[in-house]
Regions:
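Conserved SAM/SAH-binding loop
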Residues: 194
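Pre-Walker A adenine-sensing motif
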Residues: 173
Length: 476
């Protein structure tokens, strides 16, 4: 049957065939609602009990984490078709997970083994529990210049210790390299919000044994009031000066050693960091540095049926031509992320041009052996906060070098972005014919807004999404 069927889910049937990791990962991004796990998928261990091979164990644990129903099936030697007996862990568990199955039930040992695997799944961390409501939930990116952030948004950002640890270390290294001991250095925080980077900069100066003056620039009048209270409460009156206003037009007559900002978005430049920092770099001394110094944007093709279903459920063109911020959960990366472009600060070009264009290709060899469905592209950033003699400090949500916090948790200030495509594309890996994915993306800017346009050219030609910013844009 044709059409989209978001209310129809797949049932995976796992028999005796060995389960490869790539095969299972291919299904993570699809509409899988349940798994029929045949007793023939089990092997007997040295003690005579049924167990699953390691690859299948890993798959089952992942299904538990992703809330996929698992049903044991017993074919009793019958032909393939409907199982004669089925049993699901959720159907027969009593209080505290006790088993209420008759001890003589022929599938009891298999069921108990699944219970054992379920209990072995590590409990969700506090961070994972906090992020759970955002899993595969589409969020529109911020409009940082047009809108003032709400207090709850600031609070969420400020909870991410890992980000501010990285920023503090970057400022410390910059002060060591730029300010001689005994001299007074200067730091300007643009987009200071409620003050977390001001606090991080002051801590960095203490660790570097450098005296500094901090200038805080903030356009949100509510955040300015909070900053003023913070400065008074902490007794920073002689060390911190506040300039209310837009960093691009602020009249502060100062020149600083370090220009600090947390204007990065999930795709690096999507919250107008280039445009904002170009306007603020006039505050830097000729020898001054920006924190961050540079940031690189990446994209990767993904299978994400749940996300695509959510996008098309809005039934309008705007929704399919909008990139979203998403905490990925039921998503499969068809291939590895690749770089699209980079921005560096300060930008000393005679004519500053923040428009970008990239063509990215994934070859047949890079797509793996499992067929999949392309629903869109994941987007990430990797930033160099500071790189100098005193050290190199990075901040990243790239899957392979995601910044970690002090206890090993992932930095959570940014979720990845999702660029949907209007029509999903089947990536067929069954035959010998070569298959490749070719993706084009543009960053466009005019006097009033910034927007992205994107399309695919292979394996099929798609149309350009969001031409001239007709559906989505970020206001300047």
């Amino acid at each position: 049957a044709g059409g989209r069927r978001s209310n129809v889910c797949a049932l995976l049937h796992v028999t005796a065939a060995p389960i490869g990791r790539e095969w299972w990962e291919r299904w993570v991004g699809e509409r899988v609602g349940a798994c029929a796990l045949s007793v023939r998928a089990f092997v007997t261990n040295a003690r005579g009990f049924p167990v699953l091979p390691k690859e299948t164990q890993a798959m089952v644990r992942d299904m538990f984490r992703k809330n996929i129903q698992i049903m044991l099936t017993d074919w009793n030697g019958g032909p393939d078709g409907l199982a004669r007996e089925t049993i699901a862990p959720g159907d027969v568990a009593g209080d505290e997970g006790r088993v209420d199955v008759d001890s003589a039930h022929p599938m009891r040992l298999y069921w108990e083994y699944l219970v054992y695997l379920f209990r072995g799944v590590e409990p969700a961390s506090e961070q994972a529990l906090a992020e759970a409501p955002y899993r595969d939930y589409l969020q529109a990116p911020l409009q940082p210049l047009m809108d003032n952030l709400e207090s709850v948004t600031y609070e969420t950002f400020e909870k991410d210790a890992s980000k501010y640890i990285q920023y503090e270390e970057a400022v410390r290294c910059a002060l060591l390299d730029l300010v001689r001991e005994g001299d007074e250095g200067s730091v300007m925080v643009v987009g200071a919000g409620r003050g977390p980077l001001v606090r991080a900069s002051l801590r960095a100066s203490e660790r570097a044994n450098r005296n500094i003056k901090v200038y805080a620039v903030e356009k949100n009048p509510n955040a300015v009031v909070t900053l003023q209270h913070l400065v008074a409460k902490e007794g920073w009156g002689d060390r911190v000066q506040i300039f209310p206003g837009d960093m691009r037009t602020c009249a502060a007559d100062v020149r600083v050693d370090v220009l600090v900002s947390e204007l990065l978005g999930s795709f690096g430049d999507n919250e107008l960091s280039p445009e904002c920092l170009d306007g603020a770099q006039r505050f830097l001394k000729p020898t001054g540095v920006s924190v961050p110094q540079s940031y690189e944007s990446f994209v990767a093709p993904i299978a994400a049926a749940k996300l695509h279903d959510a996008v098309v459920s809005y039934k309008d063109l705007k929704s399919i031509e909008t990139p979203y911020v998403v905490k990925f959960h039921r998503v499969h990366h068809i291939a590895e992320p690749k770089s699209v472009w980079e921005f560096e600060h300060p930008n000393n070009a005679a004519r500053i041009d923040n428009e970008r264009y990239a063509r990215v290709e994934w070859s047949s060899e890079e797509l793996g052996s499992a067929s999949s469905t392309l629903h869109g592209f994941a987007a990430y950033f990797d930033a160099t906060l500071y790189d100098g003699p005193a050290g190199c400090v990075r901040c990243s949500i790239h899957p392979h070098n995601h910044t970690l916090g002090p206890t090993g948790e992932l930095m959570f200030s940014w979720f990845p972005m999702f660029f949907p495509i209007q029509t999903p594309v089947h990536i067929d890996r069954r035959g010998d014919l070569p298959t490749k994915i070719e993706f084009y993306i543009w960053r466009r800017v005019d006097a009033h807004k910034m927007w992205y346009e994107w399309t695919i050219a292979k394996p099929v030609q798609g149309h350009i999404h969001n031409p001239n910013g007709r559906s989505y844009w970020i206001g300047l």
